Structure formats: C-alpha cells, structure tokens
C-alpha cells in the first residue's frame, strides 16, 4: 500500500518485488483481496509482448485506510490505458526503484519531483536520489528517457542543470556539496544520441545507461557512461 501511494501504479511483478513476495499465487491472492475490499483498483496497459498487462493503483478508500497520501488518477477502474505516456514512464521509473533495492549502498532518499527545483530554471527531474557513503552525502537527479523528448528540450535541460551547478543554487536543494544527473534511456541508440548531443554542451555532470542495463545488472553497478569516453563507472562516481 505504501509503495502504491509513492509510485502511483504498479504491475503485479513490481508489487511482488517491492513487497518481497516470491510466489505468484501469493501476490495474486493479496491483490485480489485488496481489490474486493476496494482498497486498490485495476487498469490495463500493453505488456512486453503486446498483450494486456494489469496495473494497480490505490483508491481513496485505500489511502484513507492506510493513512497514506492519495493522488487520484483520471482513469475509470478496469479501463484500458494502452499507449498512455504517463503510465509507460511511471512503470519505467518503478523498475529503476526496484533495481535500487538490490544489494548495494543504502538508499537514503527517493523523492519524486512534481515542481521545478529552482525558481530560475523550469526544470523538473523525475526523481532526486540521495545516499550516504562513508559519512558523505551523494545527490543525483534521475531522468528516465523513453525517447519522447526532443533534442532541443534536452539542450534546455542541460543548460538549466549547468546553471544551478555553476551558480551554487543547488545547495538550497540537496544535502551534498555537488550533484550528478543520471539519464536512463530505453535503448542503446537513444543513449548514443543523447550522449553525443549533451557532450557538445558539457563533458561533466551527466551519467548515462539504459533501463535494460539497470534491470539486468543493478542500479548501483558500474554500468554508467559519461558524455565522453568508454569507461563505465558507478552512478555519480
């Protein structure tokens, strides 16, 4: 229930991973009970093979029962939301969040951002991630890219990130003394395109990988590339 409040929608497999269930039967029974009690409701999105895949969201009753924040969705229960950009993006973010739960550095903060992080920059990263390693805070903004944003949009984003980095304005936003920008793309081709484009603006600040790499090898693995060079590093290292 807490994960649904934080992440808005979850597939069955995502719900199982976040709750620690290892049995499909067990998670199906749990979801069915919650639906019958009207604590959650179901929608349908396109699965990996093109078939329909069920996703679940918290209802107002569920949020009130669990005393959790409620963010209403505009869809009717059991409706088909195939092709919805918000759903696709949120489910991709969920996969990243799950990959961060694998063995590795303790995640101190995962904060979804809905408003600009600065009054001087129209910049809304997907998530602020902060973790503590050897008594030192590391702060990273996460951008999940499914290929829907234009290169001019990425130019503006990069310029905004550079502005808050050079001005020192980030010190009012994060706990660390510096930050990085992590970009997770939906394909190797998109990764190459964004790296090449952003490298024209800066060789610093950014790290890139694919969503597939994150799912297969883990978020905290050395799977990240800088705008220039071929050496893979840890995120934000």
Show which residues each predicted segment covers.
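Non-catalytic C-terminal interaction segments of nucleic acid-processing enzymes
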Residues: 1-3, 12, 148-156, 166-237
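Metal-dependent nuclease catalytic cores in nucleic-acid-processing enzymes
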Residues: 94-100, 164-167
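Structural motif
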Residues: 8, 38, 104, 168-169
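Short, solvent-exposed loop/turn segments at secondary-structure junctions
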Residues: 7-11, 63, 115, 147, ...
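A short, highly charged nucleic-acid-interacting micro-segment common to nuclease
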Residues: 77-93
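Nuclease-adjacent, charged terminal/linker segments that flank catalytic cores
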Residues: 1-80
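Active-site metal-binding core of divalent-cation-utilizing nuclease and nuclease-like domains
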Residues: 43-45, 84-88, 97-140, 146-160
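Conserved aromatic-histidine-acidic binding/catalytic patches
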Residues: 3, 7, 19-22, 84, ...
